[in-house]
Amino acid sequence: MLINDTVVAPATNISTQAIALIRVSGSEAFLIVNKLIKDKKLEEKRGLFLRKLYFEDELIDEVVLSCFVAPNSFTGENVVEIACHGGILNTNKIINILIQSGARMALRGEFSQRSFLNGKIDLIQAEGINNLIHAKNDLALKIGVANMSGSNNKAIIELKDNLLDIISRIQVSIDYPDYDDVEGSSIEDLTNLLEIINDQINKLLMRSKMAFKNSEGIKTAIVGQTNVGKSSILNALINEDKAIVTDIPGTTRDIVEGQINLENVSLNLIDTAGIRKTSDVVENLGILKSKNLINEADLVLFVVNKENINDLDNQEIFELLKDKTYILIVNKAEKLSQTEKQNLEKKYENIVFTSAINHDIDQLVLRINQMYLNEEISKSDELILIGLNQITLVEQIKNKLSTALSVIKSGMPIDIVNVDLYDAWNLLNELIGVEYEDEIIDNIFRKYCLGK
C-alpha cells in the first residue's frame, strides 16, 4: 500500500439519504479539494468551512468541509471531510471528480490502516473499530467500544513488560551463572511469576472464546415431534414467515435456518424436521438430519405440547439431550391452566411456556438471555478479544507459556525456557501490532468497510 499518496472514499453509505460524508486523506488533501473551490481556497488549518464545489466552471454542490491538519487527525495525515448533499449520483460524481483531481480510491479499511501505520491506534483498537461496526448484539457492541477506545489495552502492555522482565532475569543467569544476587531469579520465583502470567493469558482466552461464540452466533437447533409448533417458534423468534406452518404433520422435511440477535447473544437458528415414527423415506432422511443436529448444536430448543410431553418419541429426544444444553418449550400454552403450568415446572428443569402462534415468546427470549448473561464477560472491565485472528494469537501465546512452564518444572536447562518465552513475547507484540508483516496487516484491514 502506498502511504505517501492521497486517498478518497465515502465515509457513509451511498444512498438517497439527505447528507453524505466523503473523506479525503493524505499529504495533498487540501491541494486536491482546493482544485474544486473557486473562491476562499482552504488553508492548511483546522476548522469547519462552507464552500461551493465546481468542476470545469460547473457548480456541483454546496458543502461543509471539516479540515484536520497532520498529525491531529484520525489517520495522522491531512484530512478533509466533505459533507455534501446525499444521493447516489451526487456522491459518486464528487468522488469521481476528486479522483480526476489527483486522489486515489481508498481500499477497504485503508483509513484505519493508515491510522495504525502512523501510530494513532494499535492493532487491538483497529480491530475494535471493526467489531463495533459489525456488532450483532449489545455484548459485541460493548467489547468493540472498549477495544476501540484503548481503555483495556494496557493489560497486554503489562503482560509484555512482565514477560520481558522474566526473560531478562533468565538471560542474566545464563550469561553470568556465578552472579546469584539478582532478586527473583531463583527457579521457584521464576515459576511463580510465569504461572501468574499464564493464568492471566488463560483467563483472557476463556473470556474471548466465550464472547466470540456469543457474538458470532450460537448454533441453535429447534427440535421436537411433528406439528408441535417448531416452525411457529422459528417464525416468531425471527419475526418473519421463513418456515411453512400448517396443521399437516411432517411439513418441514428439510432444514430451515434463520438468525436472531438478542441482548447478550446471537443465535443461528435451525428448524428441523419433526421426529416421529414414519414409513416415508424422504421424511426419515429429515428426521435423521434432526438427530444429527442435536449432537452438533450448542443449544437445543426442545418443543413439546401438553398432550405429547410424555410419549415415547419425546422420551427418545430427552435421551439424546442428556448431555446437551437445552430449553424445554411447552408450546400452545394458551391451552394450559396455571395449575398445569405449575405442575410441569415442578417436574421439568429449564422449562418455559410459549404461544408461538400468538407470537408470545417472551419467556423463551428472557430465558435465553439469562442463560448467556455471563458476568465475567458482560460486566467485565478487563480486555476481551473477539477477532478470530486475535484469539488464535492468544492461543499460541498460551501454548508457548505452557511449554515453558513444563520445561522449567522438569528441571531442564533454564536457557531452553527462554526460547518459548521469547516466542510468546513476540506474539504479544504481534497482537498489538508492534511487530507485523505487511501481508498480515493488509489481510486484517481488507475485512473493514470502505471508508473506515
UniProtKB/Swiss-Prot annotation:
This is tRNA modification GTPase MnmE. It comes from Mycoplasma capricolum subsp. capricolum (strain California kid / ATCC 27343 / NCTC 10154). GTP binds at residues 227-232, 246-252, 271-274. Binds 1 potassium ion per subunit. GO terms for biological process: tRNA methylation; tRNA wobble uridine modification. Coiled coil: none annotated. Gene3D superfamilies: P-loop containing nucleotide triphosphate hydrolases, Probable tRNA modification gtpase trme, domain 1, tRNA modification GTPase MnmE domain 2. (6S)-5-formyl-5,6,7,8-tetrahydrofolate binds at residues 23, 81, 120, 452. It comes from the Bacteria.
